[in-house]
Amino acid sequence: MLAYTYEENGKFVLKEKEKPTLQSEDDAIVRVTLASICSSDLHIKHGAVPRAVPGITVGHEMVGIVEETGRRVTKVKPGDRVTVNVETFCGECFFCKNGFVNNCTDQNGGWALGCRIDGGQAEYVRVPYAEQGLNKIPDSVTDEAALFVGDVLATGFLGGADFRDRRRGYGRHYRRRTYGNLYAFVRDA
């Protein structure tokens, strides 16, 4: 399959790679139907992300169709259209249990896709922790509209949220809700 790959500082290359396979019962393989380039991908290209691994396929903003799932994946099945969350997470470590999935301590957790493990600028992508990392796309939503859910909308929303009083749980007037990788803050009445 073709994959857009981070070769070295300053260099991305479109090259042939093997189609990914399941490595865990928690994985899914997704056929990518649409992906976008994020400024974070460009930061990798220009050496501003030291943890990025040369040789990985870049990309963490994508939608696609589930091709295969591991035994423990139950929320999606082959044939489902899905968004892929920017961050994969185990759901078990201290950070995941406290809502800070970007700091997941698992080797495949946090910002792994397209940084430390192969991402979605390819024909196929392996998604670790697919149970938490994939969200079904309703039939009424286009791939183009759904593409923004995994990173752009969530990042923008969180960036604009009121974090004045972080020590008391994101402000005393707000309750946090998590839906996959989409976060919502609800103002108490």
Please annotate each region the language model reported:
Residues 7, 19-20, 53-59, 113-118, ...:
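Short Gly/Pro-enriched turn/cap motifs at secondary-structure boundaries
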Residues 10-18:
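Short glycine/threonine/proline-enriched tight-turn/helix- or strand-capping micro-motif at secondary-structure
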Residues 40-46:
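Cytochrome P450 core scaffold surrounding the K-helix E-X-X-R motif
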Residues 20-35, 48-97, 138-140:
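Glycine-rich beta-strand-centered segment in the early N-terminal region that forms part
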Residues 38, 86-135, 139-142:
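Cysteine-cluster motifs in flexible loop/terminal segments that predominantly coordinate metals
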Residues 139-189:
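Mid-domain Rossmann-like dinucleotide-binding core that forms the NAD(H)/NADP(H) cofactor-binding site
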Residues 2, 27-29, 170:
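Residues that mark the start of a beta-strand
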